[in-house]
């Protein structure tokens, strides 16, 4: 008996339509299905679920290392930084990295 993979990652969002646009247009996800309060997209081979929840606190955790990491081709690293900046994505400072680590871009979605 084993867990074979992660089926999907679900994000709570305050506005489903603007979040769909962010994940489609900025992160280049493919929209699979969209309902009244839920949408599913794929980014690479990962399913991303967006679940609209308007009345929940969103700024309670401001210094957590909890995150999702996407993989990109190394040669596209600077292109992605430029793309995120051009689209006014909130790019975070990140954390100190060991020189042996791969490069990372830390950013938030529309809900932080």
Which residues make up each language-model segment?
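N-terminal beta-strand motif that seeds the catalytic metal site of vicinal oxygen chelate
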Residues: 1-17, 68
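Short glycine-enriched loop/turn motifs at secondary-structure junctions
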Residues: 2-5, 61-65, 98-99
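Short aromatic/hydrophobic contact patches that present stacked aromatics
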Residues: 8-10, 40, 67-69, 104-106
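Core segments of cupin and vicinal oxygen chelate
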Residues: 11-49
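Short, conserved charged micro-motifs
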Residues: 18-19, 75-80
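Conserved beta-strand in the GNAT
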Residues: 49-51, 106
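Helix-adjacent hinge/juxtasegments
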Residues: 57-66, 71
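Vicinal oxygen chelate
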Residues: 81-112
